[in-house]
Design a protein with these regions (language model features):
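Interdomain "pre-motor" coupling segment immediately N-terminal to P-loop NTPase/helicase cores
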Residues: 43-99
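Conserved C-terminal "switch" segment of AAA+ ATPases
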Residues: 90, 260-266, 277-342
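Pre-Walker A (pre-P-loop) alpha-helix and adjacent loop at the N terminus of AAA/AAA+ ATPase modules
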Residues: 95-141
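Walker A/P-loop
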Residues: 133-168, 197, 265
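AAA+/P-loop NTPase substrate/partner-engagement loops
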Residues: 158-188, 195, 215, 284
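Conserved alpha-helical scaffold flanking the Walker A/P-loop in AAA+ ATPase domains
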Residues: 183-207, 238-245
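Conserved catalytic/switch belt of AAA+ P-loop NTPases
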Residues: 207-246, 269
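C-terminal engagement/docking regions of AAA+ P-loop ATPases
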Residues: 338-369
Length: 369
C-alpha cells in the first residue's frame, strides 16, 4: 500500500509539472522571429491565351518580304512585336480589375451602371477557362463634352491595359481598323493589330468615338466594326496589310455616341447602351484635381486650387469637360511660366477670375517624379 501511495504521488507531481509548463506557454507573449519575414503568398499565375498563331505570323513574314522596302517599313516592327511571347498575351486579373472598378465608382457617379456591368462580366470571366474570357461591348451615350471618352480611358486604367481611340466620325474607311492591302500606295497595318501587337494584354481597350456619325459611304467601316463586335468573327479578324488572321475577340470595346437616333441599328443590336449623365459639380471638381495631380507629378510642381475659385468653376455646368481640361492646363502653364505663387485665369462669359496658388512640389519618398 505504501508503495502504491508513493507511485501515485509521483504521477500527481509529474502531472502538475506538465500543467504548469503548458499554462506558462499559453500565457507567455508570442516571440518575434528575428531576421525572418512571413513569406508573402505567391501571386496567382497570369492567364495566357494565343492571339497570334505562329503559322500565321510566319506567313505574314513571307508577305512582308515580298513588299517593297518602303511599304515593308510600316509593318516590320509591328510584326516583330506581334511575335513576342510566341504570339501569346495575358488576360487581366479579373479580381484586381473588379476592385479597381469599385474604386472608380466612388469617383465617377455617372458611370455606376456601366461599371457594374463590367464587374459582372469580370466575375463570370474569372470563373471560366481562359479561352472563354470575354467582356461584352458597351455604348456610352450622352451629350458632347461630358467626358465619355475620358471615362472610357479610366476604365482601361482600372483594367490595367492600354487603350486606343478611333474617331468613327472622321474615319476614312475600314482600313483604319483592318489595315490596307499592300497594293495600296500608302499601305499600312490597321489599328486593331497595332493595338494587340504592342500590348502585353489580350484585352486592351478600343474606344470608337462618335459612332452616331458613321456614314455608309465610308468604305465599309461599319461591317468591319460589326465583325469586331461579334466574338465569333473577331476570333478570325483579318488584317489586310499582313493578309493575316488573329484573335481579337477579347478586346474590350467601348463605343460613344451623342445621339442614339443616328447610331446604325445593326450596331445597337450588338452592344449594351448606357446613358451617361453630365457629371455633378463634386465630380467635376475631382476631375480637375486629378488633372492637376497628373501635371504635378510630371513636372515636379503643383498648383493648388484656390478653393472658392475651383468650386465656382466646377459649378459652371455650361463649361464642358473639354473646356475645363483646357482651362486647368492653361492655368498650370501660366503659373509655371510666370513663377508666381498665384495664377489667375480669366474665363469667358460670366465666370470671374479663377485663382490658383503655386508651390514647389517635392514628391514623397517612393513616389515617381
Amino acid at each position: 500500500l505504501e508503495g502504491s501511495e508513493q507511485e501515485l504521488t509521483k504521477v500527481v507531481q509529474a502531472a502538475k509539472r506538465h500543467w504548469s509548463t503548458a499554462l506558462s506557454m499559453a500565457l507567455a507573449p508570442p516571440q518575434k522571429t528575428v531576421g525572418r519575414k512571413k513569406p508573402r503568398p505567391e501571386p496567382a499565375p497570369a492567364r495566357v491565351v494565343q492571339v497570334f498563331g505562329p503559322d500565321n505570323t510566319e506567313k505574314a513574314a513571307e508577305t512582308l518580304r515580298e513588299m517593297s522596302s518602303e511599304k515593308r517599313t510600316a509593318g516590320a516592327r509591328i510584326l516583330e512585336q506581334a511575335r513576342a511571347g510566341d504570339g501569346c498575351r495575358t488576360l487581366p486579373d479579373a479580381r484586381e480589375a473588379s476592385k479597381n472598378l469599385e474604386a472608380k465608382k466612388l469617383h465617377f457617379e455617372n458611370l455606376q451602371q456601366p461599371i457594374e456591368r463590367l464587374q459582372t462580366d469580370l466575375v463570370l470571366a474569372q470563373a471560366m477557362p481562359a479561352q472563354e474570357f470575354r467582356i461584352a461591348p458597351i455604348l456610352l451615350l450622352g451629350e458632347p463634352g461630358i467626358g465619355k471618352t475620358y471615362l472610357a480611358g479610366q476604365l482601361a486604367q482600372a483594367l490595367g491595359v492600354p487603350s486606343e481611340k478611333i474617331s468613327a466620325g472622321g474615319a476614312q474607311g475600314a482600313f483604319q481598323l483592318s489595315g490596307s492591302h499592300s497594293t495600296w500606295t500608302s499601305a499600312k497595318p490597321g489599328a486593331v493589330i497595332n493595338l494587340l501587337a504592342q500590348s502585353a494584354s489580350a484585352s486592351p481597350v478600343l474606344v470608337v468615338d462618335e459612332v452616331d456619325k458613321i456614314h455608309e459611304d465610308k468604305h465599309a467601316f461599319l461591317p468591319v466594326l460589326l465583325d469586331l463586335l461579334d466574338a465569333g468573327t473577331a476570333q478570325r479578324f483579318r488584317d489586310e496589310y499582313f493578309e493575316m488572321e488573329f484573335d481579337a475577340s477579347r478586346i474590350v470595346i467601348v463605343l460613344t455616341a451623342n445621339s442614339i437616333d443616328k447610331v446604325p441599328q445593326p450596331l445597337l443590336s450588338r452592344v449594351e447602351v448606357f446613358k451617361v449623365p453630365a457629371p455633378e459639380p463634386a465630380q467635376r471638381l475631382r476631375i480637375m484635381q486629378k488633372i492637376m495631380a497628373d501635371l504635378s507629378e510630371k513636372t515636379g510642381h503643383a498648383i493648388a486650387f484656390a478653393p472658392e475659385a475651383a468650386e465656382r468653376l466646377a459649378d459652371r455646368m455650361d463649361v464642358d469637360l473639354r473646356q475645363l481640361d483646357r482651362m486647368v492646363r492653361a492655368a498650370f502653364a501660366m503659373a509655371l511660366q510666370a513663377g508666381d505663387k498665384v495664377a489667375r485665369l480669366k474665363t469667358p462669359g460670366a465666370i470671374g477670375p479663377v485663382g490658383f496658388s503655386l508651390r514647389d512640389w517635392a514628391p514623397q519618398q517612393g513616389q515617381p517624379c
